[in-house]
Amino acid sequence: PEWLIADIAIMNAGGISVPIFTTYAAGDYEYIINDCSPSLVIASNNTQFKKIKKFVENIKVISFEKLESLSLTTSEIFKKDLKKNINRNLKREMPCCIIYTSGTSGNPKGVVLSHGGILSNCEGALDLVNKLLENKKPVFLTWLPLSHSYEHTIQFIQILVGAKIFYAESLEKLIPNMIIAKPTIMTA
């Protein structure tokens, strides 16, 4: 859930979210960081931070856990008055996120998605999802990487339908996770 919280917070502050796969090679991280020029990087943990450390030396880094080097944790951020950082002027045509492809044919390519584009995708899928969930409590088991463009959009549909969301630990643990979560819907 931390990823979703961070993603929505970035958008709410008027920023542009740039989710990246945790499985990228070092060169891909370097390329993406240089390409999108982030003003801030969120590293989920020390393992992920170590992968990007040498590429973010001059960029502020925050994390949900204390990192090995100087950083700001989310608990420190939550102590601040965040109301002044809310962007109340978001427009449908404004960039929401940049999703990078896997880079199978060269460097990863960034695709800019607007708030309106994501909303249109959600609106288009909502009727179908509501029909699938008719007379059921919505329980999603998310198993695609959250940096995947499809899963990135699905997270908003999950919120719109008031779903309980479970996150699969890994593809290898998908079946045991299904037994625990008892999802009423899974997407792929």
What are these regions (language model features)?
Residues 43-50, 183-188:
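Adenylate-forming
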Residues 47-92:
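ANL superfamily adenylate-forming
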Residues 79-100, 107, 133-139:
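Conserved pre-ATP/AMP-binding loop-to-beta segment of ANL
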Residues 96-122:
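Conserved AMP-binding A3 loop
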Residues 119-139, 146-188:
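Conserved AMP-binding/adenylation subdomain of ANL enzymes
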